[in-house]
Amino acid sequence: ERIEPSNNSLFGMVVVRTALRRFPTAQRAFDRQGGIDIDRLQESALFPGTPVAILHASRDKKWYFVQAENYAAWVSAEAVGWAPRDMVMAYATRQPRRYITGSQVRTVFHPYAKQVSELTLDMGSSFPARTDWPLSEPVNGQGSLGSWIIELPLRLDNGILHFKPALLPRSADTAPAPLPASQANLIRQSFKFLGERY
């Protein structure tokens, strides 16, 4: 892959949970033949709503090398919608927000808005809360009385970032603000992952 001496960075936002890869490939590598645990090419993951700088694209344009707030690696291009930096940062800092406090929660099922239907959202993620939405106005054709209305990032077919309202059940483990940084909360949140595979 040819990398230019200087590069005009694009900006974007992760729209689905995506793997951070050491190289631009989904191929896996293990310490021994027949291994199935600890893929050595898997670095970490990024969650929907994470702003990124797009620093480089693979030759086939299927992968982006991105810089997130805390990590730099390759991600699938289909997992990122690109937009001007101001638009990306405005979404990332917009208030009020809804914070995911369960290990994972899912948006409400919607047969006609598949991009925001049953989307998995992970602990630590937060999304703009649409507290200004009139209760009498449906969200994607569905009433919102039993749900929080949040705004989710989407990737259009041409790769451009777009935002769409979605419903998050009020029964889901979420909060209107970050949890206080206390030992009790750290332990309580940690136990929400008990029994999950690493």
Each predicted region: which residue ranges?
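A general structural signal for short secondary-structure junctions and capping/turn motifs
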Residues: 10-11, 44, 56-57, 118-119
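Active-site nucleophile-His-acid catalytic modules used for acyl/amide transfer and hydrolysis
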Residues: 190-198
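Boundary regions of SH3-family modules and the immediately adjacent low-complexity/disordered segments
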Residues: 1-21, 25-37, 67-115, 123, ...
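A conserved hydrophobic secondary-structure block that centers on an alpha-helix together
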Residues: 36-72
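Loop/turn positions that initiate beta-strands
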Residues: 47-52, 121-130
